[in-house]
UniProtKB/Swiss-Prot annotation:
Recorded name of the encoding gene: rpmF
SUPFAM superfamilies per record: Zn-binding ribosomal proteins (SSF57829)
Cellular-component GO terms for this entry: large ribosomal subunit
UniProt keyword annotations, A-Z: Ribonucleoprotein, Ribosomal protein
Biased amino acid composition, Basic residues: 1-15
GO BP annotations listed: translation
Family that this chain belongs to: Belongs to the bacterial ribosomal protein bL32 family.
Chain positions covered by the region annotation Disordered: 1-26
Protein name per UniProt: Large ribosomal subunit protein bL32
UniProt source species: Cyanothece sp. (strain PCC 7425 / ATCC 29141)
Alphabetized GO MF terms: structural constituent of ribosome
């Protein structure tokens, strides 16, 4: 006979949600930091061709 599963407690639900929110906040912070570093020119791991380089390649 089928028996219903026990209900997940509110505290366990809240702990899981808090973990998820913490991970999401950390990921958002990393993305914001990366965006700022790209805009200020501090990023070392990216290569963006400048307009001068593109004009030299076309010539």
């Amino acid at each position: 006979m089928a028996v219903p599963k026990k209900k997940t407690s509110k505290s366990k639900r809240d702990m899981r949600r808090a973990t998820w929110n913490r991970k999401a906040a950390a990921q958002a912070q990393r993305a914001l930091s990366l965006g700022k570093s790209i805009l200020t020119g501090q990023a070392k791991g990216f290569y963006y061709p400048t307009d001068e380089e593109e004009e030299q390649e076309e010539s």
